[in-house]
Amino acid sequence: MFRTRFKKEILTEFLPPLRAGKKQKLIILCDGMPSIPRKQPLAEFLAAKGFWVIYPRYRGAWESDGEFLAKSPHEDILDVLDELPGEVEEIAFGKRYRISPNEIFVIGGSFGGAAAILLSLDPRIKRVIANCPVTDWGLLDRAEKAETLKENYAEYIREAFGNAYRLSDANWQKLRTGVFYNPWRHRKEVNPAKVLMFHAKDDPYVPYEGSRRFEEATGVKLKSLRRGGHISTDYITRKYWGQIKKFFDSGRT
């Protein structure tokens, strides 16, 4: 994969499609948190299917500059989109690529599922896949306790992940407001035709009930899985690629 930076801050891996088509189709991958960036095999899978793929790191996470959650993570992705169409220069050898997407899709899981849903509000985005997404940060206390015994979750992240996440207590607490980076707050704005969710009923970290409630409130489609736990986005995308591709195609104009 190639590497570039958008807005001089946001480190992004990218791949061109294995075979170029008449139209440029772009998929943006949105990571969970905390996680280790490891969606490169998924990016290769999608590039082999004919898609451009970009895999950004949120500001303040991993190789990107800035402070994590200083602004809503989905806005980091919008900042990337604001530089497209355009030429991107890969860092290692300076080769330039022209990315001019005719269609843009998003695939995000867990924490990144919230980004996917919020990105669906942007008219440039045709369709999004949200796997085991956080739909409402009212689950935060429960989710924190499932991951650590420490009372201060941001402190746990700093200790366990070091500088991988430059996360302050104040920025983490913004999630508790119900306003910041919260799909539930925007449920009345969601176009149900643009969102497809996957969620396992036995997910121990992000409760299935949140996706079911979001489905009822918005009319988005939810693919419910009996088992699987906090299932990986790589697995979901590969296993259900036929359904996902059909869903993407339904958004063509």
Pin down the residues of each PLM region.
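Catalytic histidine-centered segment of alpha/beta-hydrolase-like enzymes
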Residues: 228-241
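Short beta-strand/loop motif that positions the catalytic acidic residue
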Residues: 190-191, 196-199, 203
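Conserved alpha/beta-hydrolase "acid-adjacent" motif
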Residues: 204-210
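Short beta-strand element of the alpha/beta-hydrolase
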Residues: 23-32
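N-terminal cap/lid segment of alpha/beta-hydrolase-fold proteins
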Residues: 1-22
